Amino acid sequence: MLPPALNIPKWLEANSHLLQPPVNNYCVYHPSSPATAGYTVMIVGGPNARTDYHINTTPEFFYQYRGSMLLKTVDTSVSPPVFQDIPIHEGSIFLLPANTPHCPVRFKDTVGVVMEQPRAEGAVDQMRWYCRGCGEIVWEKQFVCTDLGTQVKEVVEEFGADQEKRTCKACGTIAETRFKEGEIVQPPRFVE
């Protein structure tokens, strides 16, 4: 028998406490569940101001349920890479192409839904930090994704605990693990 539809407002009423830093997400449909055909569906809350960029071998679908978010991306198909901020407003959707470095910045009292396709067996995810001084890669780690929530947290904590990993080899700038308060401006809630 198929499970019932998930009512987002009711789910949030009962479970919003599960959306905790540093990842702020909860997997409502896990890829190992038979009914999901391998898809991962997460409810993600704010605030989340991590500076890492995630690289996934499959596209990611974003639906912004409440409030607005900013999806920081890097186009690595050109040289030098181009940094682009994509606002995703309440009620909006966005499909991020596979292998696009992205840093989702979520603000207080915002909620979104993210859906990921099944990864190929042995597919490698990456977490990457870029230098905010010169744009070079400061540090990155590759891993086979089996549990996004716990693995991302572990990589973020590993990076944050090691100043050598956080130091840019090109210019010496020390990368932070979080944006400073007020450094990122929240896009308008709705499309203007």
UniProtKB/Swiss-Prot annotation:
Cellular component, GO annotation: cytoplasm
Catalytic activity: 3-hydroxyanthranilate + O2 = (2Z,4Z)-2-amino-3-carboxymuconate 6-semialdehyde
Record-listed E.C. numbers: 1.13.11.6
PANTHER family, per the entry: 3-HYDROXYANTHRANILATE 3,4-DIOXYGENASE
Binding residues annotated for Fe cation, in chain numbering: H54, E60, H102
Keyword Glycoprotein part of the UniProt annotation: no
Name of the protein this chain belongs to: 3-hydroxyanthranilate 3,4-dioxygenase 1
Reported cofactor(s): Fe(2+)
Keyword Oxidoreductase: yes
Primary location recorded for the protein, binned into one broad class: cytoplasm
Example of a GO biological process term: quinolinate biosynthetic process
Residues the entry annotates as binding substrate: E60, R106, E116
Family: Belongs to the 3-HAO family.
UniProt KW keywords: Cytoplasm, Dioxygenase, Iron, Metal-binding, Oxidoreductase, Pyridine nucleotide biosynthesis
Superkingdom of this protein's organism: Eukaryota
Residue numbers binding O2: R50
Subcellular localization(s) per the UniProt record: Cytoplasm
Record: residues binding a divalent metal cation: C131, C134, C168, C171
Pfam families xref list: 3-HAO
GO MF entry, a single one: ferrous iron binding
Role description: Catalyzes the oxidative ring opening of 3-hydroxyanthranilate to 2-amino-3-carboxymuconate semialdehyde, which spontaneously cyclizes to quinolinate.
Pathway annotation from the record: Cofactor biosynthesis; NAD(+) biosynthesis; quinolinate from L-kynurenine: step 3/3
Residues passing through the membrane, by range: none
